[in-house]
């Protein structure tokens, strides 16, 4: 696994987590 692939996976996971937290926050959870 290259560093570029690892970097992309990290960016995507952080982005997905931030979206999930925003959605949860809007639903009052």
UniProtKB/Swiss-Prot annotation:
Cellular component per GO, a single term: cytochrome b6f complex
Membrane topology label: Single-pass membrane protein
Cell compartments where the protein resides: Cellular thylakoid membrane
Main location: membrane
A Pfam entry, by short name: PetN
Transmembrane segments: 3-23
GO biological process terms on file: cytochrome complex assembly; photosynthesis
Record-linked InterPro entries: Cytochr_b6-f_cplx_su8_sf, Cytochrome_b6-f_cplx_su8
Superkingdom assignment: Bacteria
Keywords, ordered alphabetically: Electron transport, Membrane, Photosynthesis, Thylakoid, Transmembrane, Transmembrane helix, Transport
Gene Ontology molecular function terms on file: electron transporter, transferring electrons within cytochrome b6/f complex of photosystem II activity
Function: Component of the cytochrome b6-f complex, which mediates electron transfer between photosystem II (PSII) and photosystem I (PSI), cyclic electron flow around PSI, and state transitions.
Similarity comment: Belongs to the PetN family.
Subunit structure, interactors included: The 4 large subunits of the cytochrome b6-f complex are cytochrome b6, subunit IV (17 kDa polypeptide, PetD), cytochrome f and the Rieske protein, while the 4 small subunits are PetG, PetL, PetM and PetN. The complex functions as a dimer.
The protein's name in its UniProt record: Cytochrome b6-f complex subunit 8
Source taxonomy: Bacteria, Bacillati, Cyanobacteriota, Cyanophyceae, Acaryochloridales
Gene: petN
